[in-house]
């Protein structure tokens, strides 16, 4: 459960407001690097996560048929990596949304399995929809 913790992003909240709070899970990941269980029940028609820039108005809506989403905020970037046009990737200069199964499923018998056996086919859908909010 996330209610009452800095991990509760069910209502729009700036990530930066919560990322440094005194909370064990944030300390363990040096910030946000966690998996959230989605309440969309695999319905790809439902938005499972939204990011919006208050500066540019760019909005990212994520849709998936997966049961979870990993959110990572560049907690281990240190300025040694560069990207396009020599952009330096500094500490927490990014956010990544990765739709996936629950990461600890091999250790939880009552969770849906993430094991893929020989001959089985794996399919997953994820949509990243960008727009601009003015």
What are these regions (language model features)?
Residues 2-134:
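Active-site pocket scaffolds in enzymes
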